[in-house]
């Protein structure tokens, strides 16, 4: 009995241990089963009910869930577009930790979420985004009774690694993406309004990188941004620009180290500091043809705060800006690109569709609208090496002028200063300079002093206009103009001095494109005895309604009418001496002229005879070729010739002197000729007759004819010297291409050794005339013009 009593406690203890072991085993097995089964079960439930839960189809690779630690891992996660087989977002690996203990406090918290090899797309169609359905599904429905939320949600420490994110817009259209995206977000707690994001990524299609931080208070919409960009390609803007133009290409990249803070509710409530630069900006007909461009536009900002009326810059500069304006028969290059008066741009901005370019433009306008009424300061404002071109194709000949290099400089543009000084200087191609000095009151734009100087402009530059409107070109002349303006309270007091030194008309051009004015009579009235047009034209009155005082012009015209007949012998003497010198030193070639005329033959013969008599003497001949004009003339002639032969059913062998004269007099605006060009040149982006002719007649053919023309002129010139046996005393030097002083190609002749007596006599006579009235007054100007 004692033994039985002794074993009963032991059996009871054994049973307890056994029960505990069984329970522990069951629990352990259950835990193992839960760990083993919860992952596939969760995957099955999610994929089975994905559309019911989210409205989206979801697929996953492997799923690992630890319900005890809250760890979740999903591989090859893919969430598809709404009712589509296209992927919305995907991740090679998605990892998350849930704070399991906080579930006891009715708080669902994802303590960290990491998405590796992330891929996503934001798609916009009109005003609808591809994630709007998700927002609508998870947005609580409004009820009459407002009950406090019983379950709170936190999501913290979000990371995206090695991401690719696309932005697509069907209406524009646009398809842009960024790559190597690394995004870190502190996340959002249910009882916190702050959101902090750190980001970095590369431009997808092209070069460039961007990184920075973004912080925001989601309740009051205050924000803080830091952006560092390095050569970040701005291709994303190209589709929006494409919507604002008829044709053309665009490119640029961004350099920035910028900080900003403000509030999203008020565009003016923002403060910028740092540096912003746009590099290698190009806009043009194609990648090789610019309409507008610049190497670099840089803003260095101390403080820009429109709300506090502060615009403080260390420097604002633009390097190598370029702009080309072209005028056509009925429009210009800007009208062709952007519509009449920018209608293409305005139509796009008022269509109701989002356009990033117009949005940025409107934002900049909002930021800068109170600039001149605010406290502003720019320590240095500069334009370096600018280049501005103007081409006019509406005339019978192309007019072209270029202002380069343009340099504008101003130090300390400050509203607190009494005056702000701005200096402008540039060369004018083919010849000349322009200088402007402006001193302005920063508090009053109607209070300024202006001095300008326009010097050494060849009058022959304007021959296309003179031929078109008068039929008379000039073959010499220098234009200069100076002025001093003083403006106080919007009232002008200015002196302007115009000089045209030695202007001289050439023979009349006869073709159907030109109008006719009695230019010899007009020049006789305008030009004084010193062979100079010299007028002082004061301007007074209000800036918006100035008065031009033409007393000097009228007085000189009346004097010339009375005096000119009496002084005709003097003027003829001057003209004859100038002609003797000019003909001794130059040989002018008309457009497409191959053989010297009779007078030129006589001149060449005299030179050859002079060299024959003076074996120690020699001449050097330097061709000055008006290459652009010669090429344009040949292109137009050959195109008109091709049209003429087709119109009259003739071949090349039937084209003689009569046909040549008819083609030369034919207008390049001739209706039938224009129809012929348009029939053969199908492109709607070729706007000028010159460009159409260049496509009709291959450039290689034109260059061959130019080379042949140059060689024929040289051979014809040397023919007389060869006959006289003095060809070794004649040397040709390298040709100069450009716009010659007389508006024509010519040979410049330099004598070495002995000078011809007639030339010496002409020089002496001209020096004598230049040292006496009325030419003495302009002696210095003539010397400067020659230089």
For each predicted feature, which ranges?
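Terminal hydrophobic membrane-targeting helix
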Residues: 30-126, 155, 183, 188-192, ...
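Extended terminal
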Residues: 7-23, 304-309, 314, 369-376, ...
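Solvent-exposed beta-strand/coil patches in large extracellular/periplasmic or lumenal scaffold regions
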Residues: 137-171, 194-202, 263, 340-497, ...
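Secondary-structure transition motifs
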Residues: 7, 76-185, 267, 283-405, ...
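Buried hydrophobic packing residues in well-ordered domains
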Residues: 50, 74, 94, 113, ...
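Interface amphipathic segments
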Residues: 103-108, 174-251, 290-292, 306-363, ...
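Soluble periplasmic/extracytoplasmic beta-strand elements of cell-envelope proteins
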Residues: 73-76, 90-95, 112-114, 159, ...
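Bacterial Sec-dependent N-terminal signal peptides
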Residues: 1-53, 785
């Amino acid at each position: 009995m004692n033994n039985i009593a002794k074993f009963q406690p032991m059996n009871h203890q054994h049973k307890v241990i056994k029960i505990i072991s069984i329970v522990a085993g069951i629990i352990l097995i259950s835990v193992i089963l839960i760990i083993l089964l919860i992952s596939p079960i969760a995957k099955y439930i999610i994929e089975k009910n994905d559309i019911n839960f989210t409205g989206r189809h979801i697929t996953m690779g492997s799923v690992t869930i630890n319900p005890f630690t809250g760890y979740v891992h999903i591989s090859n996660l893919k969430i598809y577009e709404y009712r589509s087989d296209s992927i919305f977002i995907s991740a090679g690996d998605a990892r998350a930790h849930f704070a399991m203990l906080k579930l006891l406090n009715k708080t669902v918290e994802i303590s960290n979420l990491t998405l590796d090899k992330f891929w996503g797309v934001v798609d916009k169609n009109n005003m609808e985004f591809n994630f709007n359905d998700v927002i609508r599904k998870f947005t609580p429905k409004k009820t009459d009774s407002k009950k406090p939320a019983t379950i709170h949600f936190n999501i913290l420490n979000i990371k995206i690694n090695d991401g690719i994110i696309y932005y697509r817009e069907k209406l524009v259209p646009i398809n842009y993406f960024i790559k190597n995206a690394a995004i870190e977000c502190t996340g959002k707690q249910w009882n916190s309004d702050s959101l902090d994001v750190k980001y970095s990524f590369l431009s997808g299609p092209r070069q460039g990188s961007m990184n920075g931080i973004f912080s925001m208070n989601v309740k009051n919409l205050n924000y803080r941004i830091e952006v560092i960009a390095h050569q970040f390609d701005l291709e994303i803007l190209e589709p929006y620009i494409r919507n604002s133009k008829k044709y053309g290409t665009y490119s640029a990249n961004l350099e920035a180290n910028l900080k900003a803070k403000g509030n999203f509710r008020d565009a003016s409530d923002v403060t910028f500091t740092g540096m912003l630069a746009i590099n290698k900006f190009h806009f043009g007909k194609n990648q090789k043809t610019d309409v507008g461009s610049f190497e670099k536009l840089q803003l260095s900002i101390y403080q820009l705060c429109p709300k506090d009326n502060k615009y403080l810059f260390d420097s604002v500069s633009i390097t190598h800006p370029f702009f080309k304006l072209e005028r056509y028969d009925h429009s210009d290059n800007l009208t062709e690109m952007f519509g009449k008066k920018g209608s293409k741009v305005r139509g796009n901005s008022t269509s109701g569709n989002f356009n990033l370019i117009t949005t940025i433009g409107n934002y900049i306008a909002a930021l800068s609208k109170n600039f001149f009424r605010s406290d502003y300061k720019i320590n240095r404002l500069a334009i370096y090496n600018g280049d501005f071109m103007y081409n006019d194709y509406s005339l019978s000949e192309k007019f072209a002028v270029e202002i380069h290099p343009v340099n504008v400089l101003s130090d300390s543009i400050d509203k607190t200063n009494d005056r702000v000084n701005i200096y402008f200087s540039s060369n004018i191609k083919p010849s000349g300079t322009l200088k402007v000095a402006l001193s302005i009151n920063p508090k009053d734009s109607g209070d300024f002093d202006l001095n300008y100087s326009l010097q050494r402009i060849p009058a022959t530059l304007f021959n296309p206009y003179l031929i078109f409107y008068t039929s008379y070109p000039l073959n010499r002349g220098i234009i200069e103009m100076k002025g001093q303006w003083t403006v106080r309270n919007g009232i002008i007091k200015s002196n302007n001095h115009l000089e045209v030194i030695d202007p001289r008309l050439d023979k009349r051009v006869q073709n159907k494109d030109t109008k006719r004015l009695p230019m010899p009579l007009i020049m006789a009235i305008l030009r004084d005895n010193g062979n100079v047009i010299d007028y002082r034209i004061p301007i007074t009155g209000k800036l918006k309604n100035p008065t031009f005082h033409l007393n000097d012009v009228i007085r000189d015209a009346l004097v010339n009418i009375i005096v000119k007949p009496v002084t005709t012998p003097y003027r003829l003497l001057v003209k004859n001496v100038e002609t003797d010198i000019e003909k001794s030193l130059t040989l002018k070639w008309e457009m497409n002229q191959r053989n010297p005329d009779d007078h030129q033959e006589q001149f060449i013969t005299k030179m050859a005879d002079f060299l024959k008599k003076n074996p120690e003497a020699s001449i050097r001949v330097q061709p000055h070729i008006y290459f652009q004009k010669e090429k344009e003339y040949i292109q137009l002639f050959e195109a008109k010739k091709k049209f003429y032969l087709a119109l009259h059913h003739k071949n090349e062998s039937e084209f003689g002197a009569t046909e040549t004269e008819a083609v030369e007099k034919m207008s390049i605006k001739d209706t039938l000729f224009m129809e012929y060009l348009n029939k053969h040149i199908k492109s709607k982006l070729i706007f000028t007759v010159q460009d159409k002719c260049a496509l009709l007649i291959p450039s290689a053919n034109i260059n061959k004819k130019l080379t042949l023309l140059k060689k024929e002129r040289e051979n014809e010139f040397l023919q007389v010297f060869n006959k006289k046996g003095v060809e070794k005393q004649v040397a040709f030097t390298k040709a100069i291409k450009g716009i010659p002083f007389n508006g024509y190609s010519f040979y410049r002749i330099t004598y070495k050794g002995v000078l011809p007596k007639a030339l010496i006599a002409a020089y002496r006579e001209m020096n004598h005339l230049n040292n006496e009235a009325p030419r003495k007054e302009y002696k210095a100007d003539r010397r400067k013009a020659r230089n």
